Amino acid sequence: YNPIVADDLIAEPYAVGQRFTCRPDDAYSRFTIESEGAPLKLYDGRMNHNNGWFVLSSEIPEGKTEGAVRWIIKPNVVPGWLSAPVVQVSQVGYHPAQPKVAIVELDRNDPARGQAALVKITENGEVPVQTLNGEEWGQFLRYEYLRFDFTAVQEEGLYKVRYGASESAIFRIASDVYDRGVWQPVLEYFLPVQMCHMRVNEKYRVWHDLCHDDDARMAPVNRNHFDGYVQGPSTLTKYQPGDSVPGLNVGGWHDAGDFDLRIESQAGECYILALAYEAFNVNYDATTVDQAHKVVEIHQPDGRNDILQQIEHGMLSVVGGYRSLGRLYRGIICSHLRQYVLLGDSAAMTKNIKGDDDDRWVFTEDNPPRELTTAAQLAASSRALKGFNDELSAHALEAAQELYRVTRVEDDKALSAKIHAAAELLLTTGEEVYRSFLLENLNFIAKNIKNLGWIAARAVKAVNDAHFESELRKAMQTLKQELDQLSAETPYGIPYHPY
């Protein structure tokens, strides 16, 4: 079986014809497709692949290079139809003291305007709380928007907002609204389930067995992988194509869908967690992580801080790869298409026996901006791990400092990344070399404040220079005016300019 040629073995179509009508029973969903040439064929997408949808196709006639397939698509139009109002509230809920605004999305052809009703859900049913007058916000993209402010309501409980026949989901107002089920599921479920090189249990359930314990073989040179990884004419390491590289069968989280480990995903997630740990002093324990036996137990505390255990897990992959390869890996990914399309237990991708044909490949690259960004992420992770895994912390810092020292800067993108690395290394070490580099590049930082402001601001106290702080503040004030203007362009009060 090969996913690329799966369609060479065409299953029988459900139906064949020149016209196809979808949902003829529903005027609001009905549409018709008519082919002016080759017949339409309706397939079950599960036959040749595992696609959970129906497939409508026409075969391209042999030798036809223009006008090979011509379809006419006719949606059914219901005169006077209007999109129903959509009432939007926070999915998390609200703290009693915070601003509370419900936003109602309206069809732009709907002239009607009404009041909204805030109701409380009690053990005896609904109790009216307040009639809300809307603020006309105006048009954003395809819709008109109204805003209904109910900040004054602070009594804790369950609520919903109703506008005409539409209503919001039920939400909470409570002082403990952020204590459960907000960011916590990332630590409780998402990251543990994605952990590579582990068996992940949750009571009776096994999310996946020990996987990829045979990682990884050096990728072939001059190879453009089907997922987009590119190995150039050299491996950039002492290893030759096909060599088993030690130190890679530990740590990391699976990328969604194809289970690969990208350096920016691994180091980047560690960075997110490290900054959250520092900013909010997160101390949360719901999971057992046993690195020695490569076992994870979800919802079984082990007395160790989960966020630090996850930073450790990511750094084991990044630092392990760096120390084995002498450089960062670009990514670790399966070598065969049959593995790439795997739906099921990640442990089924390889046999966990090093050195055979099913082992994943490790790719390398020469990419200064990515290497310097990773240096910043390594430095921050090193801080978080100090006192938790001192050896790994020291190795992460060594890698960060070496990357900072040896990576060349040839363009603004690389310079921005080196400023990022300098800021985090200054916070980690306090060394003058990093402080001096930030001071030398003050003008560049101010000029690129949109991208570098948050980075420089993190280090401003460590730089401890009045001129640096003053110039940074001036640039930040200009940026704030720009962001305020962008935020005013949406009913949600956040900037939105699609690329």
Region spans (language model):
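Trp/Gly-enriched beta-strand surface patches
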Residues: 1-62, 110, 123-124
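Extracytoplasmic/surface-exposed domains of secreted proteins
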Residues: 26, 34, 52-56, 62, ...
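Exposed beta-sheet edge/beta-hairpin loop segments within beta-rich domains
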Residues: 56-63, 363-369
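Short Pro-Gly-centered flexible turn/kink motifs
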Residues: 60-75
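Non-catalytic surface loops within mature trypsin-like serine protease
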Residues: 75, 106-108, 152, 175
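Glycan-recognition and catalytic cores of secretory/periplasmic carbohydrate-active enzymes
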Residues: 80-86, 95-99, 114-145, 152-170, ...
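Short edge beta-strand/loop segments characteristic of extracellular beta-sandwich folds
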Residues: 88-90, 101-108
